[in-house]
């Protein structure tokens, strides 16, 4: 059995709240139970988790964001990959499927709808951040 946290690059996810909703994307190819998730992708050599979150958001959704703060890191319970989560603020653009090879949908999700998109729950620091930023 291989240790995926060292064999594969870390993944950085962007947590973007706008107008009381959080941006989620649906992967064209599911990763186990993982279908809807935050914009995310591999951290490239020489890149910080925050820089990767900003880059991946632009590549996947066409939305320009700025990193606000790193919320935390963990080994994802469903994928075994090392994940970093960065809170980001939108700067310009409109979220859309910009990379049709990777995504097939984007959605701005209200606080109460999150369990419908992520039924297995969120990483606690991400949930806490969303609880503070979004009306229940």
Predicted regions and their residues:
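Conserved N-terminal beta-strand and adjoining loop/helix that marks the start
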Residues: 2-23, 42, 73
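Short beta-strand micro-motifs in enzyme catalytic cores
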Residues: 10, 34, 82-86
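Conserved hydrophobic "DFG−1" position in protein kinase catalytic cores
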Residues: 16-17, 24, 88-90, 108
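Conserved Nudix-box catalytic region and its N-terminal flanking loop in Nudix hydrolases
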Residues: 17-59, 63
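Nudix hydrolase/Nudix homology domain
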Residues: 31-36, 100-136
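A short coil-to-beta-strand element that immediately follows conserved catalytic motifs
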Residues: 63-72
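Active-site-adjacent beta-strand/loop module that shapes the phosphate/pyrophosphate-binding cleft
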Residues: 74-96, 107, 122-129, 133
């Amino acid at each position: 059995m291989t240790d995926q946290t060292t064999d594969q690059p870390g993944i950085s996810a962007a947590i973007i709240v706008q107008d009381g909703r959080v941006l989620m994307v649906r992967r064209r190819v599911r990763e186990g139970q993982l279908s809807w998730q935050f914009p995310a992708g591999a951290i490239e050599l020489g890149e910080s988790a925050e820089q990767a979150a900003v880059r991946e958001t632009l590549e996947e959704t066409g939305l320009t964001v700025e990193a606000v703060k790193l919320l935390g890191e963990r080994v994802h319970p469903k994928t075994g990959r090392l994940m970093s989560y960065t809170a980001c603020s939108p700067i310009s653009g409109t979220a859309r499927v910009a990379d049709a090879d990777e995504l097939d949908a984007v959605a701005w999700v209200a606080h109460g709808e999150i369990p419908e998109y992520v039924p297995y729950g969120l990483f606690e620091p991400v949930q806490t951040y969303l609880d503070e930023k979004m009306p229940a």
